[in-house]
């Protein structure tokens, strides 16, 4: 393990050793949340319909999230170039967490669909932001390996999502399908705030 936690690379500052492991872990958590919420609601949908009604709009609980995350991804990439990847990534986490909390508090199917879209807007930033930050903090020769690990998050989330969703519905409430994001997201925020130090662009370009 290198005695020096930092070395110049790319547009940011490459990390090594414990510093890299800590930051990478936080980025993995962010990606995991974004991927998890694509599938975690699937086993909760029958219970949600039984509580909120709105059977005809059921598919939009998933679709609104996916559409919002896909549509917002290019915008986050540009905002990261303009204002720095760290503040934009933090904003994405906060949007995602607000959307998660509001989704759990929903009192109608319409509210849930709208708040899932808000969640998706945050998720788009988590996905693109994590990959962009990795490109900044991981030395170039190791970048492919770390990107591969990030990619495996989606495989894990696709299996864990329905299982965790089913467990939470049975053990507590369908609302905890969304509340479960809060402690994980807060941990990721704290690590990024205090351990990730990136160069913020001095020159800002128009969108």
Question: What residue spans do the PLM features occupy?
Answer:
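Transmembrane-helix bundle of Major Facilitator Superfamily
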Residues: 2-200
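Short, intrinsically disordered, charge-balanced linker/junction segments flanking boundaries
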Residues: 203-207
